[in-house]
A protein has these predicted regions:
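N-terminal glycine-rich FAD/FM-binding segment characteristic of electron-transfer flavoproteins
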Residues: 1-218
Length: 218
């Protein structure tokens, strides 16, 4: 926004209290928020969630020079599926794992950060880009920004708002429209501290063999 002077609109799907998160984003500089919320959307997996958010973005409108930005993955499900699925449903090109973005007209040059290096690719707008956290340092909240946030527009989209969109059908949204659902989740037990063996090579080898034998591993 600082470099290009563009308008930033934040979308989120969740219960009504998610408005607070959008207001926080507006206090950090976002120009407008869109809250997608309805009981019909509850229980959605990544497929159904992307279906709903894609319909909301399409209803709001996608312009020729728009860039849709998403995080690499959510911190709860950790699937990294929603961003790419939205791109597919909106028939937009997509780039994942973006660590640097440069814009020249309607062309973006994006540096993708991979496990074993990086890849530089170009894409035309409109497009979807999922970003790693190192891409940018978020602004800090300020008192002035917090007051200003409540004067900025916040749009609420419900099932009634979106029900006529081709992507929205009760068979493809919510729990009923989710191909997957979580049966249970748990926090794994903490592991104890590792054991350090000191000494020369033969000495530590003998100690390790003794420990493994005592545990009936060898």
């Amino acid at each position: 926004k600082d470099e290009l002077g563009c308008k930033v609109i934040a979308f989120t799907m969740g219960p009504p209290p998610a408005e607070g998160m959008l207001r926080e984003l507006m206090a950090m500089g976002v120009d407008e928020g869109v809250l997608v919320t309805a009981r019909e959307f509850g229980g959605s997996d990544t497929y159904a969630t992307s279906q709903i958010i894609a319909a909301a973005i399409d209803t709001y409108g996608v312009e020729a020079d728009d860039i849709i930005l998403a995080g690499r993955q959510a911190i709860d499900g950790d699937t990294a599926q929603v961003g790419p699925q939205i791109a597919e449903k909106l028939h937009l090109p997509q780039i994942t794992y973006a660590g640097e973005i440069k814009k020249d007209g309607n062309t973006l040059t994006v540096k993708r950060i991979l496990e074993d290096g990086y890849m530089t690719v170009k894409v035309n707008t409109p497009c979807m880009i999922t970003c790693i956290k190192e891409l940018n340092q978020p602004r800090y909240l300020s008192v002035g920004g917090a007051f200003e946030a409540y004067s900025k527009p916040l749009v609420t989209m419900t099932y009634e708002t979106l029900k006529d969109h081709p992507l929205i059908d009760k068979s493809t949204i919510g729990l009923a429209g989710s191909p997957t659902n979580i049966l249970t989740s748990f926090t794994p037990p903490q592991k104890g501290a590792g054991m350090m063996l000191e000494g020369d090579g033969k000495d530590t080898t003998d100690k390790l063999a003794g420990i493994l034998a005592a545990k009936h591993i060898i």
